[in-house]
Amino acid sequence: MIVLISSITYAQKGSWYIGGVAGYGSNTTEPTNGTKSTTTSWAFGPEIGTFLKNDIQLGFILGLNGSTDKFGDDKTSEFSGFSPTVYVRKFKKVTDNFSLFSGLYFNYLSGTQKEFNPDDESKASGFGISLGIGAAYALSPRFTAVGQYGLLGYSSVTFKQNDTETGKESDFNVGVNTVGSSSFVQGNGSGAVFNIGIYYTFK
């Protein structure tokens, strides 16, 4: 689930908006003869931004997320991630209530993976850049429905174990989560390629 808050079609230069993304998920596998396994995950990304011009939007998302794996009642692994994102969007007004936009997203990627049987810890850090497109429809002077699709994305992540570099991973993908993702760091949103939300604006 993703929830975004701001207003676009009625926004003017100097307008500010707040909002964010939030998500939670849980998956349990319980075989007929065996021990159940459970994975839970969450994501939270408060957002703030402003309009530099009537059609140029600058925003920042502070991305936090994590997950836990259990086998029976025993925790087997745990992940925590931090992925702040800065973005710039350019809007094109089609009608009084409807606009199209394109956006460029830059994000820092970091995360820690802990294994408990046996004890082990891996860390990763890097960066990502992506291009997205979307549409905005004004429901009222304050509320706007927004949908966005991640077209292209590139990320580069370095992995370390006990402060020793163990590898690097670079990805270039068509169809990406515009608020940050990689195989190690899932970012600050739902991980979805297409996101829909409601925005709210204030002066």
Functional labels for PLM-detected ranges:
Residues 1-19, 90-93, 99, 202-203:
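Outer-membrane beta-barrel biogenesis signature
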Residues 10-67, 71-72, 185, 189-203:
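Short glycine/proline- and aromatic-enriched beta-strand/turn motifs that initiate or cap beta-hairpins
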Residues 16, 38-44, 78-84, 98, ...:
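Residues that define the transmembrane beta-barrel architecture of outer-membrane proteins
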Residues 20-24, 46-50, 64, 86-90, ...:
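Residues on the lipid-exposed face of transmembrane beta-strands in outer-membrane beta-barrel proteins
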Residues 28-39, 68-79, 111-125, 158-166:
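Outer-membrane beta-barrel translocator domains and adjoining extracellular loop/strand segments
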Residues 32-36, 48-50, 74-76, 90-92, ...:
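Outer-membrane beta-barrel proteins
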Residues 55-58, 96-98, 137, 142-145:
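Repeated loop/turn-to-beta-strand initiation elements of outer-membrane beta-barrel proteins
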Residues 70, 139-203:
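Predominantly the C-terminal beta-signal and adjacent terminal strand-loop region
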